């Protein structure tokens, strides 16, 4: 810690490092140990880009202006629906290729996207093999059409389908095809692979493949290693991060602030405190000043280590060197201290946040509320919940989940159910964690009928129907 005194006042706030704000990561995880997929949905973010559609050209038709772009999209969606209907007829003896040819649809990147997304939406455990085959069959058919060339996004979307189907070898073959067709693999390509293959225990093989790749387009990162490290951190491959870092040094690449932040954070998560501070010293010796994210890692370490005084000293040091702590740093402290059960210290830093002119945001309030709930102090959590709404901070799905869990722990199921309705009326859609928290607690309390009412309501609204089996002993009637 003494080496911190030698830091210069330069603060390099790097946008690419924003994932290192660990208090924000709090709102991406399950709260209170609910066993679910962290309660988060991971919608595929595929953007449609077409230079031909950068502008909208309106024309007069039947006395009304109709957007050419809008008509194109509506026509494409209709074509996609026809394609999906045709693909569903695929079976032995049915010539799918000829049937698709007879549709005479206009092939475009948007059509490919609509069809593949349509397949992805219908994918289930029972039909995953069929979905993978249909997606690839359609993909190949499109690629064979005159004057059409797949985009990198189309490849990534098909990779996503293969990933959901557990077709790891098919994913790797698709990447080979992608490279053969002249497409550079990107950080997005790697991220899709590592997210899937990491779960299958193939992460190191994938990393080695990309390290050796000559077609890996790692921009906007400084070098390929930073792109790889960034993706590994996103899937919590902390041990592999250390290995990649050593490989990077052996290959003669120099780390930068982003590199150090990632490796330090990984070592923090692995509980390797000594190595964390050795890396910090290396960073300073290499002439790099710690940025806001570096300080956030250190604050998180001190907070989870139950060292509020040392954390306070670090905050003061930050001010001395010209780095003004923000709400994110105070939130990190509150989060770490609440996990250590130090609720009084949490309240102190919450008040300190306001004193220094920072406005606690929804994440800060949610961390504080969750701390109170975990500590069995429901009344204080309710007061904090009321305070945040009065100050214009609208509760998010994680805030509501904490409060619902708190009411359930206190046996106040009527209030918990009322809060579920309140969040829906406010336009805050419950995620699966919220439903499972309420349903499982109701069942554990012997309130089976009430639990089934919640599930029934969830199903009627079309929410998470594919995850019903994860709710304890639930059977659809």
Swiss-Prot record:
Q: Does Transit peptide count among this protein's keywords? A: no
Family (UniProt): Belongs to the PPR family. P subfamily.
Q: Disulfide bonds, which pairs?
A: none
The PPR repeat ranges on this chain:
151-185, 186-220, 221-255, 256-290, 291-325, 326-360, 361-395, 396-430, 431-465
Which keywords annotate this record?
A: Repeat
* Protein name, as recorded: Pentatricopeptide repeat-containing protein At1g55630
Q: Which InterPro entries match?
A: Pentatricopeptide_rpt, PPR_P_subfamily, TPR-like_helical_dom_sf
Pfam families xrefs = PPR_1, PPR_2, PPR_3
Gene3D superfamilies in the record: Tetratricopeptide repeat domain
Organism superkingdom: Eukaryota
């Amino acid at each position: 810690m003494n080496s911190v005194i030698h830091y210069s006042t330069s603060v390099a706030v790097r946008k690419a490092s924003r994932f290192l704000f660990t208090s924000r990561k709090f709102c991406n995880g399950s709260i209170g140990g609910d066993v679910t997929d962290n309660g988060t949905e991971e919608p595929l973010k595929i953007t449609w880009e077409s230079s031909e559609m950068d502008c909208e050209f309106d024309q007069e038709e039947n006395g009304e202006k109709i957007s050419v772009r809008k008509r194109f999209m509506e026509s494409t969606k209709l074509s996609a629906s026809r394609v999906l209907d045709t693909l569903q007829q695929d079976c032995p003896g049915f010539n799918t290729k000829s049937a698709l040819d007879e549709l005479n649809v206009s092939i475009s990147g948007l059509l490919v996207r609509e069809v593949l997304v349509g397949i992805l939406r219908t994918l289930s455990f029972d039909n995953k093999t069929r979905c993978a085959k249909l997606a690839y069959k359609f993909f190949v058919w499109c690629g064979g059409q005159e004057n059409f060339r797949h985009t990198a996004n189309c490849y990534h979307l098909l990779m996503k389908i293969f990933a959901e189907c557990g077709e790891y070898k098919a994913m790797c073959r698709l990447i080979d095809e992608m490279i053969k067709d002249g497409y550079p693999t990107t950080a997005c390509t790697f991220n899709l692979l590592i997210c899937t293959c990491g779960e299958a225990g193939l992460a190191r093989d994938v990393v080695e493949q990309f390290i050796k790749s000559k077609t890996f387009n790692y921009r906007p990162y400084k070098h390929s290693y930073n792109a790889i490290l960034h993706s590994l951190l996103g899937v919590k491959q902390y041990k592999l991060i250390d290995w990649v870092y050593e490989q990077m040094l052996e290959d003669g690449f120099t780390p930068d602030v982003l590199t150090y932040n990632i490796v330090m954070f990984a070592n923090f998560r692995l509980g390797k405190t000594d190595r964390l501070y050795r890396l910090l010293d290396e960073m300073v010796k290499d002439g790099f000043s710690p940025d806001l994210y570096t300080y956030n890692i250190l604050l998180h370490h001190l907070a989870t280590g139950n060292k509020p005084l040392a954390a306070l000293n670090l905050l003061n040091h930050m001010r001395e060197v010209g780095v003004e702590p923000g709400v994110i740093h105070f939130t990190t402290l509150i989060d770490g201290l609440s996990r250590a059960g130090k609720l009084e210290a949490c309240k102190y830093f919450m008040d300190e946040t306001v004193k220094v002119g920072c406005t606690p945001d929804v994440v800060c309030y949610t961390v504080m509320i969750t701390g109170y709930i975990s500590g069995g102090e429901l009344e204080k959590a309710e007061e904090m919940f009321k305070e945040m709404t009065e100050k214009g901070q609208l509760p998010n799905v994680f805030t509501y989940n904490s409060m619902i869990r708190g009411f359930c722990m206190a046996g106040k199921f009527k209030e918990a159910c009322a809060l579920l309705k309140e969040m829906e009326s406010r336009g805050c859609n419950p995620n699966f964690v919220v439903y499972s928290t309420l349903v499982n607690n109701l069942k554990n309390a012997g309130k089976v009928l009430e639990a089934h009412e919640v599930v029934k309501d969830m199903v009627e609204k079309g929410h998470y129907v594919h995850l019903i089996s994860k709710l304890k002993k639930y059977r659809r009637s």
